[in-house]
Every structure is written in C-alpha cells, then in structure tokens.
Amino acid sequence: MEKIKVALVSLGCDKNRIDSELMLYKLNEEAELVKDPKEAQVIIVNTCGFIETAKEESINTILQMASYKKTHNCKVLVVTGCLTQRYKGELKELIPEMDIMLGVNDYDKLLESIKVFLKSGEKSFYHKYSDTKINEGNRILTTPTYTAYVRIAEGCNNFCTYCAIPRIRGKYRSRKKENILKEVENLAKQGVKEIILIAQDTTMYGIDIHGKKVLHELLRDISKVEGVKWIRLLYCYPEEITEELIEEIKNNDKVCKYLDLPIQQISNSVLKRMGRKTTKETIINIIKKLRKEIEGITLRTSLIVGFPGETEGEFSELKEFVSDIKLDKLGVFKYSKEEGTSAALMEEQIDEEIKEKREEEIMILQQSISKDINKEKIGKIYEVIVEGIKEDMYYGRNYEMSPEIDGEIYFEKDENVKIGDIIKVKVTHSLEYDLIGVVYNELSK
C-alpha cells in the first residue's frame, strides 16, 4: 500500500482506546497517520455501542466522516468497534456509505481490507464473535508519553441485567502474565511512568487460567519493571477483592492507593434486579475494610440512577449511602435501556425527567462531599505527575487522581519542571474537585 493518509477517530472507553492504538501500529508501516480526518484518504471510526448516548455519538460521527467523501479527501470509510459488533447487519443497511466494517475481533483484516478496496472497490464486512481471542500486540500510544493503559483481560462473565458487554466482547479471558509484563517493559522503555490496569473486571484476573484470582501477583511483578513509578487499578468489583490484593496495595509503594469500585447501586432490591452478585452489606464492609487496612486510600465509584422499578425509597437509600460513606470520587449515570438485555424488558421503566432529577440530586450531594474532602488536603504534600499548562499554571495529578475522570492539582510555573516529571507539590488551596499548590522541595524524578 502506498503511503496513503489515514486518520482514526476513537470513541468510547479506554479499552476501545487500546484497540485503536493496536490498529494505528498495524497501519503505521504502510500509511501516513494524520490527526485531522479532513486530510485523510482513509478514515477509521472505532465506535462505542454501550449506551444510547454513546450509540448516537458513534452514528453521528460515522455520518460526519462519510460526508468527507464529498467535501474532502476521503476515499475509504472504515467502521469498527462495539457498535458494529453489536448491530452488524442493521448498521450495514443504515449507513451504506461504509466501505469496510469490522467487528471487535477482526482487526487483523484491517490493512488487507483497505488494500482490496483501494484496488478493486470491493467492500468488506466482518463481524466474527470470539470467546477466545484477545487483541494484543504493539501499539502507538494516544495517551501522553508518561501514561499508558494496559488491558489485562477481555470480556465479562457477570451478565448484569442492564449491560450488553458480554454479548459484544464475549466471556472473561485473562491475558497471559508474560505477555502483560513484556508489554509493560516495552512501555517503560518508551518513557511511560504510570501504568493503568483495565478490564471489564480487573479483580477477576487469572481466574480462567489458574482457577483463582491472582491480580496481587501481577501487581507485584509489574512493580519490578524498571521505570514504572505508579500502577493504578480501575474497574475493581468490591465483592471480588481478596485479602492478598489488599495486602499488595497496602505494602507495594508503586501501587497507587486508589481503587475504582463500580458499585452502581446500594439497595439490595435494586442490586438483585440488576443481577449484581453482591449486597449492600458486602459493599459497605469492603469499603470500611479498605479504609481501615490501607492508610490514605482514595475510593471512586460509579452509580446508576433510574433503574427500572427504582422507588423513592430505594433512591433515598442510595442518597443516604452517598451521604454517610462519603466516597472520595463519584460519577453518576442515568439508566439506559439497552436492546438485548433483560432490564430493557422490565416493567416500571423510569421517566427521563425523574432520572435527570435523581442524577442531579446525587451530583449536588457529592459536590459538597468532595469540597469538604479537598479542604482536608490543604497543607499536605503529594507526588504529582506534571501533565501540562493552562493559563500560565502547570497542572498534574497525584495518586488520588485518575486521568480524565478526576480532578487536577494546579501550581505556578517552575523553570525546572517539565511535563512528565514527577515532583512534590504542597497543597495551599482547595476547590470542589481540584487542588492548588506550590512546588515543594527538589525535583523528584
């Protein structure tokens, strides 16, 4: 393939980002990668099909990119990702402007499909379902040079009643530890300091290979890789957290004292309707245990409001939980009715207006909690990874802050500081979600 210009538009979650980075690497040797789709002859859209708003964004993006065939240089439109895997034939009929459609297990056909279309105009449509394949290999990072996401498993076995992911991504399958470690070593050699481990459920890592959960062993081995400074864990189901994992987080200096716990709800009746394999008591007990065992741990969660049948009493129970437990970070999503899920067939679907009201109530409550928590940080000194400059101020993150979803720490410019450095910052002021501070002491790289 001649050096044709290719642009990739990646939508959705960080797991999708990794798929995009794998595709970019495959394309790089035979194509010129450009950031602006208006300049590209080949445009690839990696879609999200998880919830209604994500589907709408994906379809709108596909249609916008398709218009570039008339207004700009686009000759080939490739669409891939969760939306194509989920809707297959429907999408093909809905958007005939697509030239190539690939499912989430078909990225190995990307380059050849583009070549065939450019040569003969023959369209290609693949959507293979796989419960065994895991997309892995070399990547071109789209994150800052000091941070990278590493997928440790694919798929999900939970089959929550509201979620279509198992039907899109297949059953849970862990990557081999040696492959993960090799990837981390390569990333560290490129200058990556922060490794963020992701999966649909990171806490289940190894269960399918070893018959037991071995995330704690993986953390221990990754921490031995030269150049890795921080290891961050996302998507940890509270009911699957083991004593060994708690001990590893507690005692391993490279593991951020930070856990993302996708709780979703707290009322036992709602949890049961959701198909969650946990209870209110289990969730509260593990939160208390984590706070007792791991000094300074930051806990983040995501909640769903407006699940079918959610009563005022169940919602009040959720508000009471948020108010009493006071989690450090919290995001709220309105329930999205998804085709192919049992929750979509449930009676007592909640009006959109009520969902919005409940979402707002939780966020206002959490805003106040976050403001109080941040006030307590004034005077504390943190290691901060420097990320950039906004309005003559540097900004970065400490161990309590995950990229893009949490707040930031702002501090005055310092001529000795470079983006990607890890430095010490003393907090002097606090806001609802962000902190303000000054560079403290010498540079700590």
UniProtKB/Swiss-Prot annotation:
InterPro entries: Elp3/MiaA/NifB-like_rSAM, Methylthiotransferase, Methylthiotransferase_CS, Methylthiotransferase_N, Methylthiotransferase_N_sf, NA-bd_OB-fold, Ribosomal_uS12_MeSTrfase_RimO, rSAM. It is found in: Cytoplasm. Its EC number is 2.8.4.4. Its cofactor is [4Fe-4S] cluster. GO terms for cellular component: cytosol. Its main location: cytoplasm. [4Fe-4S] cluster 2 binds at residues 156, 160, 163. Residues 4-119 form the MTTase N-terminal domain. Residues 142-372 form the Radical SAM core domain. [4Fe-4S] cluster 1 binds at residues 13, 48, 82. Residues 375-441 form the TRAM domain. Binds 2 [4Fe-4S] clusters. One cluster is coordinated with 3 cysteines and an exchangeable S-adenosyl-L-methionine. SUPFAM superfamilies: Radical SAM enzymes. Belongs to the methylthiotransferase family. RimO subfamily. This is Ribosomal protein uS12 methylthiotransferase RimO. It comes from Clostridium botulinum (strain Loch Maree / Type A3). The gene is rimO.
